[in-house]
UniProtKB/Swiss-Prot annotation:
(2S)-2-hydroxy-3-oxobutyl phosphate binds at residues 85-86, 127. Belongs to the DMRL synthase family. Its EC number is 2.5.1.78. Pfam families: DMRL_synthase. This is 6,7-dimethyl-8-ribityllumazine synthase. The gene is ribH. Keywords: Riboflavin biosynthesis, Transferase. Catalyzes the formation of 6,7-dimethyl-8-ribityllumazine by condensation of 5-amino-6-(D-ribitylamino)uracil with 3,4-dihydroxy-2-butanone 4-phosphate. This is the penultimate step in the biosynthesis of riboflavin. InterPro entries: LS, LS/RS, LS/RS_sf. One of its GO terms (biological process) is riboflavin biosynthetic process. It comes from Xanthomonas euvesicatoria pv. vesicatoria (strain 85-10) (Xanthomonas campestris pv. vesicatoria). GO terms for cellular component: cytosol; riboflavin synthase complex. CDD domains: Lumazine_synthase-I (cd09209). Pathway: Cofactor biosynthesis; riboflavin biosynthesis; riboflavin from 2-hydroxy-3-oxobutyl phosphate and 5-amino-6-(D-ribitylamino)uracil: step 1/2. Signal peptide: none annotated.
Length: 154
C-alpha cells in the first residue's frame, strides 16, 4: 500500500493570496499571517503574489483567472463576511465558498478558503490573530502542504 502525504518543505511553486479589501482591519491581519507563514517555511517574497479585490463576492472570479493562468501552485483566499440584518451574508458567504470549491475542482489548483463567515466582529478578530489563531497562517500552511502533496500524487 502506498501512502501519500504532503509536508511543509519549501517548494519552487508560486503562491497567490487573494484577499478582499472589505473589512480590511481583519483581512490585512490574515494576509500578513499568510505571508509570514509562507516566509517562515522558505517561500521567498518573490514567489508570493498578493491580489486585492473589493469584497468576498469577487474572490472566486479572481481565483479562477489566477488558477487558469497555470502560474501558481496554490491560491489562498482571504476575506471576512460578518452577519448583518439581511440575508446578504448568506448569499456572499455561501456562494463565495461554492465558487472557490468549483475553481479548485475545475482547474486542479488547490484553493484554500480563509474567508471568515462570522456572526460578530469579535468572532473575526478572534480568528485574525486572536484567541483562535490566525486563519491566514493556517491556510498558508495548508496551501504549502497541498502543493507538496499534488507533486507526489500520480
Amino acid at each position: 500500500m502506498t501512502h501519500y502525504e504532503g509536508d511543509l518543505r519549501p517548494t519552487t511553486a508560486r503562491f497567490a493570496i487573494i484577499a478582499s479589501r472589505w473589512n480590511a482591519r481583519i483581512t490585512d491581519v490574515l494576509v500578513a499571517g499568510a505571508r509570514q507563514s509562507l516566509a517562515g517555511n522558505g517561500i521567498g517574497e518573490d514567489a508570493i503574489d498578493v491580489i486585492r479585490v473589493p469584497g468576498a463576492w469577487e474572490i472566486p472570479i479572481a481565483a479562477n483567472r489566477v488558477a487558469q493562468s497555470g502560474q501558481h501552485g496554490a491560491i489562498i483566499a482571504l476575506g471576512c463576511v460578518i452577519r448583518g440584518d439581511t440575508r446578504h451574508y448568506e448569499h456572499v458567504a455561501d456562494l463565495c465558498a461554492e465558487g472557490l470549491m468549483s475553481v479548485q475542482l475545475q482547474t486542479g489548483v488547490p484553493v484554500l478558503n480563509g474567508v471568515l463567515a462570522v456572526e460578530r466582529v469579535e468572532d473575526a478578530e478572534a480568528r485574525a490573530g486572536g484567541s483562535h489563531g490566525n486563519k491566514g497562517e493556517e491556510c498558508a500552511l495548508a496551501a504549502l502542504e497541498l502543493v507538496n502533496l499534488m507533486e507526489l500524487l500520480p
